[in-house]
Amino acid sequence: MVLAKTLHQEVYQTLSETFDFANNDQRLWWHSTAPMFQKILQTANYSIYAQYQHLSIYKSHIIPFLGVYPTRSGERWLSILTRYGTPFELSLNCSDSIVRYTYEPINAATGSHLDPFNTFAIWEALKKLIDSQPGIDLQWFSYFKQELTLDANESTYLHSQNLVKEQIKTQNKLALDLKGDKFVLKTYIYPELKSVATGKSVQELVFGSVRKLAQKHKSIRPAFEMLEDYVQSRNKVPTTDDSHNTPLSSRLLSCDLVSPTKSRVKIYLLERMVSLPAMEDLWTLGGRREDQSTIEGLEMIRELWGLLNMSPGLRAYPEPYLPLGAIPNEQLPSMANYTLHHNDPIPEPQVYFTVFGMNDMEVTNALTKFFMRHEWSDMASKYKACLRESFPHHNYEALNYIHSYISFSYRNNKPYLSVYLHSFETGEWPVFPEGLIAFDGCRRDLTCYK
C-alpha cells in the first residue's frame, strides 16, 4: 500500500524532472495544472502506466495550445470554457471513474489579424492528436465546423467592421475522455459569431445544421424531431416570472470525432429558470419521456436537488469574465444537453446543476452522501480528499469556485454523474496570490522548475 501510494505521488514529480519545456508559459501551465490532473487520475484508479501516458500526451500535445500563462494584467485570449476565461478544465465521471479534460486550442495567430476569432488553431491541435492515436474521424466535425463557425472571409469582415462586442468569441473546443490508456475525442462548437456574420439566430444555426444532417443520416431523425418539437412548444408559451416555461435557447453543439455510424450529436440548451420543476420539464421533454428509466432518473434528480440545496430563481449569464482571483458572487442559469443516438427515437437528456458560486465544502458533502447512498463507496471515500489535496493550502470550507457544474444522466438502469472542476494553480501553487502572479519568482528564475 505504501509503495503504491509512493509510486502514484512520483508520477507528476518524475515527469517534472524529465520534461523540457519550449518556453516559460508552457512550464507554468504544467506546474499549475498537472498536480490536480495526476491526483484525479489516481482517484479514478488509473494505472501507473495510464497516468504517465495521459500526462505525457497532455504535456506534449495540449499544453502547447493553451496560449500564454494567464495573469491578472497580461493580455490573453479569453475562453468561454471557464468564468475566469482560462482555456483548460478537468472533469470527472464519478459513476464510472473516467477522467475528461476540455480545452480551447490557442496558437500564436489567435486574436491577431491572421485569426482574430480563433477559428483555425483547432486544426493544428487536431493534427497532433491524430498523429498520436488512430481512429479519429473528422467527417462530422468538418461538417459542423463549416456550418457553425466563421470562414476566413466572415472572420475578416467581422474584424474589419468591429462587429464583435460582448459576444462569446470561443468557437470551438476539444475534449478527451480518458479510457484506460487511450482517449476518445469530441468537439464542442459555439455558433455565436456565425450568428453575427449570417444574421441567423444561434437556434436557427444549430437546429438547421442538425436537420440537414438528419436528412442524410436518418437514424438520428426521429430523436431530432422530438427534441425540436419540445423546444418549439417551450418557446411559444407566454412567460411569466413564476413560470418554469421560460424560453429555451441553444448555446452549443457537440459530437464525437469517430465514425459517423458511432458518433453522437448533442444539442445544448440554456434554461434561465433554475428550479426543480424546470429541471423536471427538461428531463421529461415536457412529458414526452415517461418510461420507467425516465422516472427512476427523475427520482435521483430530485434527490440531488435536495442534497445540494439548490437556490431557485431566474438567472442570466453575466457578460464580462471574472478577473483572476475574484471570488464569485453569482449564480448561473441551468443547462441541459440532448444526445441523438442512432436508431433511438427519443433524445437522451443530461441535466446540469450549476453550482459555481456555491460553497464547495457543502457541495462536496452533498456529493459524498449521494455516492454513499448509491454504493459508489470508492468514490465516496476518495472524493473529498482528492479536492483537498488538489488545493492543499486553501481554506476549503470557504471556497466557492472549485465546482462549476454537476451533470446527471440515466441510461440502461444506471445513473451517470460528472463534476466539472476549476483546474488552475493547483497542488503546491497558491490559487489566488496577493501579487499579479503566483510564484512570481519562478517566472523570473527558470531554474526553480525545470
UniProtKB/Swiss-Prot annotation:
InterPro entries: Aro_prenylTrfase (IPR033964), Aro_prenylTrfase_DMATS (IPR017795), DMATS-type_fun (IPR012148), Trp_dimethylallylTrfase (IPR017796). Substrate binds at R100, K186, Y188, R264, K266, Y268, Q350, Y352, Y416, Y420. Its EC number is 2.5.1.34. It is an enzyme of class 2 (transferase). GO terms for molecular function: tryptophan dimethylallyltransferase activity. Catalyzes the first step of ergot alkaloid biosynthesis. Ergot alkaloids, which are produced by endophyte fungi, can enhance plant host fitness, but also cause livestock toxicosis to host plants. Homodimer. This is Tryptophan dimethylallyltransferase 2.
